[in-house]
Regions:
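Conserved short-loop catalytic and cofactor-binding motifs
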Residues: 7, 37, 76, 180, ...
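Aromatic-enriched alpha-helical interface/lid elements that frame and gate functional surfaces
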Residues: 139-202
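Active-site-adjacent "lid/gating" segments in soluble enzymes
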Residues: 10-151, 155-156, 163
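Rossmann-like NAD(P)-binding element
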Residues: 2-10
């Protein structure tokens, strides 16, 4: 496993093809910031910078403080390490099944984007006529303010939402056509948010 910037191994006479001449069964993983080739390949890569480049920063907007922000842990670094572990496992399996060694190229930008894409790009993936629209997952990732601090409140299906309404002593909301079903709650999200905000602050 190496994570030098592109070209360092080659200049040291340790290019993958050279090492495979010495040992054809080697599984070599090359981790870079932005790939072995391309306009950014020479740049240094740091987790916060790749968070910004892959979209994490853009969706960290807190409605109360509407500015972009970082995820405050080394998210992309860790996503890349998991991707590397999976890639190594695949390379070892290929070797076990009779293939020669492998050279696997992995970058922070690729791993970060792959980890971000499913929910981070939810609003831009299924679009057009006939597509059921709803809030992106990250729109719902918000703290709930109460009278003495903040909590994390999450409800999924109708039964959970109806339990929330009853806990707030608002059982009539269970039968309110605006909030009784998931589709209705999506259509009336702003009205529901206003009610919840008022009730949780009591």
């Amino acid at each position: 496993i190496e994570n030098f910037r592109p070209g360092v191994l080659e200049r040291a006479g340790l290019a993958p093809e050279v090492m495979h001449e010495w040992n054809p069964d080697l599984v070599i993983v090359r981790i870079s910031g932005y790939g072995q080739t391309g306009p950014w390949s020479h740049k240094r890569a740091y987790d916060p910078v790749t968070q910004a480049a892959t979209g994490y920063v853009a969706i960290q907007n807190n409605p109360d403080v509407p500015i972009p922000d970082l995820v405050r842990n080394a998210l992309v670094d860790k996503a890349t390490s998991h991707s590397a572990a999976q890639a190594i496992t695949a390379g070892l399996l290929a070797r076990e099944r009779g293939e020669l060694g492998q050279t696997i190229e992995l970058s922070l930008i690729d791993s970060g984007l792959a980890f971000f894409w499913p929910d981070g790009m939810m609003k831009n993936t299924m679009v057009g006529e006939g597509v059921r629209e709803g809030p992106a997952l990250y729109d719902r990732y918000q703290l709930t303010e109460t009278s003495d601090g903040h909590i994390v409140m999450w409800a999924g299906g109708d039964n959970e939402w109806h339990a929330v309404f009853r806990c707030l002593d608002r059982p009539e909301l269970c039968d309110d056509e605006r909030f009784a079903t998931g589709a209705a709650r999506v259509q009336n999200g702003e009205a529901l948010a206003n009610i919840l905000h008022q009730e949780f602050k009591k």
